[in-house]
Amino acid sequence: MMKKIILLSFAGFMMVTLTLAQMGQKESPVIAKGAKLIRLSDQYSFTEGPAVNKNGDVYFTDQPNNKIIKWSATDNSLSVFMDEAGRSNGMYFDKQGNLITCADLNNQLWQIGMDKKVKVLVKNYNGKLLNGPNDVWIDKKGGIYMTDPFYIRDYWKRTPVTEQDGQCVYYLSPDKKKLTRAADNFKTPNGIVGTGDNKYLYVSDIADRKIYRYDIGSDGLLTNRKIMCEKNSDGMTIDHLGNYYISNEKGITVFNPKGEQIEQIPIDEKWTANVCFGGKKLDKLFITALKSVYIIDMKVHGVR
C-alpha cells in the first residue's frame, strides 16, 4: 500500500493523515487506532530537545533562534517560554520541576527554573571545555547523563578545536558535585534515554549508525555495552513497555526491547531531530522535525 498524505488546515494547525504501509494489514502495536499525525506548527527554524513536565506540557527549543517554546497539554497552545536560552539543545525535567538543558552556546549544562533563573551545573571536565553537551536524561536518583559530541558551531566564540580526548557520555552525581565519564569509545554520541526501571541506558552513536544499550550501575557507570540495532539516530525516547523510539531522516522508528523493529512513523520532512511523550496521560508522541512540531495519539505511554 502506498503512503498517502492529506493536508487539512484548521484553526491554525495542520493535520497530516498518514496511511502507513503496515496499516490496513495489521493494527499498530504502539499507535492509537485511527490516530492522525498532527502538525502543530511549521513556524520555527530548527526544532529540538522536547521535554515533558509533570503536567504533560512539552518544552522544546527553536535552536537557531535561541528560544525555548512551550506546548500546553491543556489547550494545545504554543508560546515562547524563554529567550536567550543558551542555544539549548537536548532537555529534560528534573523532579523539582527545573528544566535541565544542554546549553551549547558555551558548552555547558544548565538548570533553568520556571522563574527563568539559570544555574550552570557543568562547564568543563577536568578543567577543559566540554565538546558541546547535546542530549540529556535524568535517573530516579537525580543523577544526570549527557552526551558530549563535537559539532563545530558557527556561533561559538571558542577556538573550534576540541579540548577533550574523546566524545563521551558523562554522569553528573545526584548532588551535582561530581562529573564522571560514564562511557566512551564513540564516534559521535548523540541521543540518550533510560528505561523506566533505570536498569538500562540507550545511547545513539549517530556517526557510527549504532544504538547501544548499557547496564546502569549503582554508581552511575555504564557496563555491558550491547549493539541493539545498526541505525543512526538524533533523539530518542522510550515507552512504558520498554520500546525505544529513534529519530532520523526516515521519521520515527520504533523497536521493542529485543531490538526488533515494530513500527515506522514517516514524517514528511528531510530530518526528524527528536521525540518525547507528552500530554496529561503521557500518551501523545511529540516530534520535532526541522521547522515543524507534530503530535500523534498513542496506545502506549511514556515514562518519567
Where do the language-model regions lie?
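Sequence-structural signature of mature extracellular/luminal beta-sheet repeat domains
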Residues: 22-304
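Bacterial Sec-dependent N-terminal signal peptides
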Residues: 1-25
